[in-house]
Amino acid sequence: GVTILTSLNSYQTKKYYNNQNVNQLVKKFAINAKKNNLDGIVCSPLEISTVRKEVGNKMLIVVPGIRLEKKQINKKDDQKRILTPKQAINLGADYLVIGRPIVESNNPLKTIKEINKSIIEK
């Protein structure tokens, strides 16, 4: 199941979803996903805790909106609700979707190695 697109900010979410805030909607979608026995759910890194609280460890959490550091974010980047790989994993993400930071990198292999290193570091 999918919750709210990571490209939507709180204003847009309220506009499109009848004045409900992101966490209310994500909670509702997580409960619905659990009730329907889905294997996993896609959510922004900022909602991992909300989803995990509702679904426990019985569902996988897949997380897009992963960025390396705020200073590296392109101004044209449409992702609004983001965290680093390490932050998302620490919150309970099972899988990370890391596209643009790698694809748009001048050296994708180096970027992947940096991501791995950042996850392992304490």
How should each PLM-predicted stretch be described?
Residues 30, 48, 85-86, 112:
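Generic hydrophobic/aromatic pocket-lining and core-packing "Φ" positions
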Residues 42, 96-97:
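Conserved beta-strand positions in the central sheet of alpha/beta enzyme cores
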Residues 70-94, 110-111:
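Catalytic cores of alpha/beta
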Residues 63-64, 98-101:
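Glycine-rich beta-strand-to-loop/alpha-helix junction loops that act as flexible
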Residues 89-91, 101-122:
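C-terminal helical cap(s) of enzyme catalytic domains, especially alpha/beta-barrels
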Residues 33, 51, 88, 99, ...:
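Conserved, mostly hydrophobic/aromatic
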